[in-house]
Amino acid sequence: GYFEGFAQNPYELTILHPEQLWGATALTDLDASKNKDVFVINRYASLVEHPIMYAQPDYTTFTVQGMEILIAVYSPNRKVTAASITPEMKQMMTAQKNFLGDFNATKKYAVLLYLSDNTKPDAEGFGALEHPTSTTVVMPEMLPIDELKEQLKDVVSHEFFHIVTPLTIHAKEIANFDYNNPKMSQHLWMYEGVTEYFANLFQINQGLITEAE
């Protein structure tokens, strides 16, 4: 939360963590030490839109048309690695950038994948949530790798397109969100419907799937 009247103030977030853990995020760490991270954010709304996943380092990076992409994975039993899903993610996100053309809402984008261990008490709410510079995804670790890759292609492509709407094109209720007295937008049909339409259209347009599929 935030103190009343301070929502528009800059924030400095300091996180102390074990050396073996690394924070995957689209934010820039201003501290070079191995057990301390420092992030500076311009206002509270930006702070809550930048998730950070701490785990043993397992990530890849690549660049698509000037945008740095980070793929970070937490797999408790190490059944899946970032390297094992990166080729499909790179192909899909390259196709999306080709489809979007010059639209470039961020210079860095992070995909944070948390795989849940179904044999232990762990995350059960599977799905994904978009942010202006990242997507967080929670899926079961037990999924066969090919099925996981296929689901990730659909899920991440949908969430990535949210950088267009509602993260760039949106109503004033979204732009100036009141956390204490939220007013829901009437444009969910556009935010989700248009996004899902283009998440499928670009795959056809870029030859990733056929129109029949």
Tell where the protein language model's regions lie, with residue ranges:
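Generic, ordered loop/turn and secondary-structure boundary motif
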Residues: G1-E4, T28, P166, D178-N180, ...
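Non-catalytic architectural context of zinc metalloproteases
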Residues: G1-T106, E124-G127
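Alpha-helical structural motif
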Residues: N9, I85, M92, V156, ...
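Small-side-chain structural scaffolding
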Residues: A24-A26, A128, S157, G193, ...
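Alpha-helical scaffold segments in carbohydrate-active enzymes
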Residues: Y44, A95, E159, V194-L201
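Juxtacatalytic substrate-recognition/specificity segment
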Residues: T61-H187
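Acidic/His/Gly-enriched intrinsically disordered linker/tail segments
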Residues: I169-D178, P182-E213
